[in-house]
Amino acid sequence: GEEIGGTVHKAPAAEAGYVASLHAAVDVLYEQGPALYLLLGGDGLASYVASRLVQTGAARPRILGIAGGTANVGPIIALTMDELESLTLDKISFVCCDALEARNGARFLALGFNDLVLGNTLLSTINGQALTIDALRLAREGVKAPAVPLGGISKDLRVIKNGMEVTGGLASPAQAVLSTLQQDDTYGRAVMGALCMAAGDRHTAALTLLDAPVVSFESRPEGKTAFMTASQLLFRSGDELSLRGLFPEVCLAADGNPFPLENGSLSVRLVEDAVMVYERR
């Protein structure tokens, strides 16, 4: 019963044809009232489809995602083709899955089911090779161009939670990542820092600010032969989180789908039980 988005997001010109066709196909399927949606693709396709279903008004649509993309990390993409072939209807069960709603000012951008990443790059595949590519060029021109992550996404990042600025985090992070913690077992895992404090709370998400990019195929010393620094902040259903002061070249990657930002800002909130996904046993 929760309103998502308000107005349907219009994709940048370069992707408008693809996204419009995808939305039209989803709308046709939705009108048929299927018991579940079978999806073959990657996390980006899954995010586009699930977001459209929720925006259209589908109440907790059941989505069975089959891996066919670059990363296939889920939670919607839950099975391989081989696993699907051995699956029987009596063994299919679903579980509710939270999402993160991303807005740029009053403009709805996307729902993220795995993560929302702020940077200038995203992960993709070119001629069968997994590469780090320029997010803005893909969004605006439809071009997959190899790129190197920025050294920083802001000179003085401001994080606001429920109208109050939260200080003490990295002011010039290389990347910012937001994700729900519903699918993760953080109980007793003190090594995870603040994330272990979310154990037992079903509808919790986290913001992590990093001094080196982790969403990248580039090999880096941070975390291996050099320290990586992270600032973590938890938020839950009902909270409103905003990030301000982002550089113009910073783009939102919602489950790998690029969305340019205006005025260097992003607002995020957690949406409880947005869809239902295949439950692994």
Regions found by a protein language model. Give the residues of each.
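Generic beta-sheet signal
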Residues: L64-G68, L87, G119
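Structural motif
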Residues: A35-L36, R62, D273
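Short, acidic/small-residue loops that bind anionic groups at enzyme active sites
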Residues: V49-T80
